[in-house]
Amino acid sequence: MTKIAVCGAAGRMGQRIIVAAREAGCTISGALERPGHEMVGQDAGLIAGCGALGVAISDDLNAVVEGCDVLIDFTTPKVSLKNLEVCALKKKSIVIGSTGFTPEERALAVELAREIPAVLAPNMSVGVNVCFKILKDVAKTLGDDFDVEIVELHHNKKKDAPSGTAVRMGEVVAEALGRDYNKVATYHREGICGERTKEEIGMQTVRGGDIVGEHTVYFIGMGERIEISHRAMTRDMFSRGSVRAAQWVVGKAPGLYDMQDVLGLK
């Protein structure tokens, strides 16, 4: 039975991960929150609404990591890298669902994961990861004859933009077309900005209300358009995916994996 610790246990995602882990038959071995959080000391199960677990929410990262097989982390890149470093020192696995990593932060994650098996994925949804595979195939088939635009929508509390999922979609398409995403991504158009180049991949961001997450990739040709969309109705698919990744990664060889590895889509 996999022993899972949850970082950000009192948050919306942390609570859903605790519920999903219990439903999957895993043991919640630890629950972590930042020092000074008002829920420190409270039973993690009661906070998550799944009944008392006898596991108090803690602010002691080292102790929580020591007692688990794998840590699930949906926080921020800065916090995730700190957690990854501690997991590497203690030879524990980690699943990271945080978004907004810079290229430098991702490179550091790759380096730290030389010591342990780690999953880093901007989206833990099975459906989204199937979309990644579809996008690769569609982009290769259509080639340079279709313009590519990506639109993503999220709730008004989301802190990073564009979403990590949208960026990964752009990277998948760019790789399939032999382009450098960082050079062709266009995040803003305003005023007289000139004609659209053939190589660019447009990225548009919408924030409002309580939208869990929606992503649409448009392949726009002359007289026809293909739209590949994914809409998240609840966060539960992310929590279930993270637990699936946690069960998968324990015992794997050291290295940085993603959900494509977890789902066998590579």
Swiss-Prot record:
- Which residues make up the binding site for (S)-2,3,4,5-tetrahydrodipicolinate? 155, 164-165
Q: Where in the cell is it found?
A: Cytoplasm
Annotated signal peptide: none
- From the UniProt record, give the pathway where this protein acts: Amino-acid biosynthesis; L-lysine biosynthesis via DAP pathway; (S)-tetrahydrodipicolinate from L-aspartate: step 4/4
Provide the active-site residues from the annotation.
154 (proton donor/acceptor), 158 (proton donor)
* Cited PROSITE patterns: DAPB
Q: Could you name the domain of life of the organism this protein comes from?
A: Bacteria
CDD domains associated with the record = DHDPR_N
Per UniProt, the keywords (alphabetical) are: Amino-acid biosynthesis, Cytoplasm, Diaminopimelate biosynthesis, Lysine biosynthesis, NAD, NADP, Oxidoreductase
What InterPro entries does the annotation carry? DapB_C (IPR022663), DapB_N (IPR000846), DapB_N_CS (IPR022664), DHDPR_bac (IPR023940), NAD(P)-bd_dom_sf (IPR036291)
Question: Any one Gene Ontology biological process term?
Answer: diaminopimelate biosynthetic process
Q: Which Pfam families match?
A: DapB_C (PF05173), DapB_N (PF01113)
Instruction: List its EC numbers.
Output: 1.17.1.8
Family of this protein = Belongs to the DapB family.
Q: Briefly state the protein's biological role.
A: Catalyzes the conversion of 4-hydroxy-tetrahydrodipicolinate (HTPA) to tetrahydrodipicolinate.
- What name goes with this protein? 4-hydroxy-tetrahydrodipicolinate reductase
Q: Which organism is it from?
A: Geobacter sulfurreducens (strain ATCC 51573 / DSM 12127 / PCA)
Gene this protein is translated from: dapB
